[in-house]
Each structure stands twice: as structure tokens, then as C-alpha cells.
UniProtKB/Swiss-Prot annotation:
This is 6-phosphogluconate dehydrogenase, decarboxylating. Pathway: Carbohydrate degradation; pentose phosphate pathway; D-ribulose 5-phosphate from D-glucose 6-phosphate (oxidative stage): step 3/3. GO terms for biological process: D-gluconate metabolic process; organic acid catabolic process; pentose-phosphate shunt. Its EC number is 1.1.1.44. Catalyzes the oxidative decarboxylation of 6-phosphogluconate to ribulose 5-phosphate and CO(2), with concomitant reduction of NADP to NADPH.
Amino acid sequence: MRNTIGVIGLGVMGSNIALNMASKGEQVAVYNYTRDLTDQLVQKTGGQTVKPYYELEDFVQSLEKPRKIFLMVTAGKPVDSVIDSLVPLLEEGDVIMDGGNSHYEDTERRYDSLKAKGIGYLGIGISGGEVGALKGPSIMPGGDRDVYEKAAPILTKIAAQVEGDPCCVYIGPKGAGHFVKMVHNGIEYADMQLIAEAYTFLREKLLLPIDEIADIFDTWNQGELKSYLIEITAEILRKKDERTGAPLIDVILDKTGQKGTGKWTSLQAIDNGIPSSIITESLFARYLSSLKDERTAAENVLAGPETEERPLDQNVWIDRVRQALYMGKVCAYAQGFAQYKMTSDLNGWHLPLKDIALIFRGGCIIRAQFLNLISEVYDKQPDLSNLLVAPDFAEKLKEYQSGLRKVVCEGISSGISFPCLSTALSYYDGYRTGRSNANLLQAQANYFGAHTYERTDMEGVFHTDWY
């Protein structure tokens, strides 16, 4: 009996994907360019149907036709290298699937090259981390629909399940699947930073004990803020350091990095004139955090505001922070889904925004309760430009904007940095401003650079002689 699927790349994610497939009844062939990872996986299987191969040709020949090969290798040149090695061994109609974090434009290049050879190619976004890979991730496949249909029975089996539905849906042509995963990661960056800023207010402004803050996040996770990231934040805050007994959060260095997909999201938005400001600010917050030595030195040089300490009603302010966080998250998701919509329109992808929201509900890092509402909005208004103007969200933001404004103002007056909460507020106010100050920018550009401008009272382009 031939193997039904092959997995190449047996790091943590690849191994767990292979184990996931095996647990769902697939006959899985596995291959890694180094033998040790293959041997480690075999030791874990406990009799599951994972069969190791140590020669690529043997691996390929073991697969039933049309062959389906799932790549879980490092994005970039390693993917090209593996594909180059596979192509001479494959036949027309075989399918290669890239489940790594490849840039969607690389996926489109590979798709074009392989299609010319008669080989199907799917760029598959996978979210959920190592646990999701093993127990069921959110899966975002892009490529030709007929090629997807060949792999769909396996992909839908290994995906997370929510209310009986798999968190896997055909996204669109060519690089659409990896594009959706890329922006997902940008939303994830923003979501994480917004939560960090809410935590900062509770701890530094309200001076709440860390265990009490954990309880607050637990409470929030029972309501409209219910999400994976809120849930794990409560767990993180309760964790004690085994060496010191202190809260682990207090001994973790405040310096973080990024793996590239967040940056790609911002660059793609910039290239296409899409205002993904909250997502981009969350990236810049990470860059600023990496300047640890500079920040430590600046702390002793740069003055903050002189403020009079005044008592704050904790219950009132805790609820304001909740409102601020909810509104910030809605604005961040609105930016991400607007980026989906605008890019889909530019490329003719027809991204299924309703379904994208649904498959984000399980397995993935940004799974959240309000994704149900986002899906309902796009079900009613599939061509909606921005979630902010959907009646259900607009009414909630009308109610919650006061909380966000008060939290941002209190933070600013206290010298606390709230890059994403303040940017969310600016985005909200900017988006609801029918007549902006961009007319002055146009006049300035015309003054010094002879750039033309349009008028409000007649059609055409104009230039003024300012001198």
C-alpha cells in the first residue's frame, strides 16, 4: 500500500503536521535532509502510520499518484532548493504544497514555474504554532481550485474544527493563501501589542498586583474579549519563575524581535497605499524594544511629565481599559481585513472574507469570539470596505470611544507609551473625518514642487503660481 501523503521538513512544525496527518488515518511518508530529525520523529510515533525515508527518490516513489507532497521547510531559498530537487522526480498532475511562511510573491513565482511543468502548487498558510500543527491548525490554501480539491480531503481532516466545520477553506488563486497568512500575522502583532499596553496601564497606572491583573484578564476572557491571546496572557501573568519565585514576567527581558511576516504586511500595505497604521506601529514598537541599552541610558536623560498623583477609581478605570482594548482590537482587525479587501480587488482574487473570519476561529493565534461577528458582517455586506462602518461595530465603538480616549489621554499625561492604542484612536478619528487636512499638504506640495492638485468645486487638475 502506497503512502497517501509525504511531508518534507521535520522540524517541530513539520513533525507535528506529520503526526497530525497520521492520527487522522493517513499513510504518511516523511523525509528530512538530515537523518537525526527523521529518527527522532520515528521514535515518537508509537506505532502511528509514519514511514521514514532517507533518500528523496525513495520517498517520492512511495507515494500514491497523483503524489501529494507537503513542504515544511524554512522560507526562502530552502523552499526553492527542495522544489528543484523534487521536480525531476515528479510527474504531471502531482502536487507540491508549501506550508511554511513563504512570502506570497515567492509563492506566485513558484506557482508559475511549476504550472508550466504540469505540477500543481499550493501555497498554504498555517496558523496555530506547534500545538496547532499537532492538534489542528487554521489552514489557508491558495492556488488553483482543482489542485486544492486533490488535497482538500487531507487538509480539512487535519484542520481545527469549530462547531463541526473545518478551519480550512479555499482562499483564492496563486499566492492568496500565503498572503492571507501574512496579514494574519500582522494582525497578530497588533493584537499582542494592544494587550501589552492594556496590561501596562493596569500595572503602572492603577498599580494593581500582578495576580489581580491575571484575574482581570480571566474575567475579560469570559466576555466579548474572549480570545486565545487574552487567555494565555492570564496564564503568563500567573506563572512563577522557578529560580527566583518571582512572577516570570518580571524576569523576562523586555526586548522582542520579529520573524519577517509582520514587516511584510506593513511593506505590502505601504506599496499599495493601504493605511495599516496599527499593524505597522506594533512592528515599530518591537524595533524600539530591541534598543534596550539605548532606552536604559535615555531613562536617565529624558524627562517625563510632572504630574500630580491622584486617586483613580479602579473599577471605573478597569472597565475603561477593557473598552479601550476592545476598540483597539476592532480597529486592528478592521485594518487587516481592509488590507485583504483592497489587495483582493487589486489582484482580482475575490477573497472570501466571511470564510476567512470563520477559519480564524479555531487553531490559530488570533482566534477570538468577535470573529463570529466579523463573519456575519461580511455575510451581509461582502463588498464592505471597512469593518468600522458596519452597524454592529459602529454602535459599539460609539459607546466605547470614550474609554479609549480617556485611557490614551491618561497614559499620555503620565508619560506612558501607548503606540497602538493611540494609533487606533487616530485611525478611528481619521477614518471618520470627511474633510481632512490633506488639502494643506497638497497646497504645500504644489508650492515647493509644482505638484498639481484637484479642487472641491470643479473637475480637473490645477497649479497655482505662488510667487
